[in-house]
């Protein structure tokens, strides 16, 4: 499992190529950025997981939350078989007000992923019980199908 946390696309491509060269089955996780960066990352071959698109410092719009994803990005992720991951450890470290905003953004992302049939998972996977993961997804308005897919 390789986690890449940079905003330079050429550096991301180089790290993916290096990781895939040493181990072709390596899981590549990329930390999300703004929407344009996320779109370019979702178009790169070899990416497996986009981590925490909801975590950013941009303000929400008046009528809509800025959750880091939109319907086009979700369709692109679904087409390229890329999973969207929610970083639970980062969510637990937030203060109450910021945690509420982030949870609202996660709910919006779950709805978008449900509509476009994009797989959503929790990160890190090994740390939590399967029943807890399924419960978390369903509490945040995910379908039971999404909850089952999140533990596989």
What positions do the PLM features span?
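Charged catalytic cores and adjacent phosphate/nucleic-acid-binding surfaces used
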Residues: 1-27, 36-152
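Active-site histidine-anchored catalytic micro-motif
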Residues: 30
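Divalent metal-binding segments
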Residues: 33
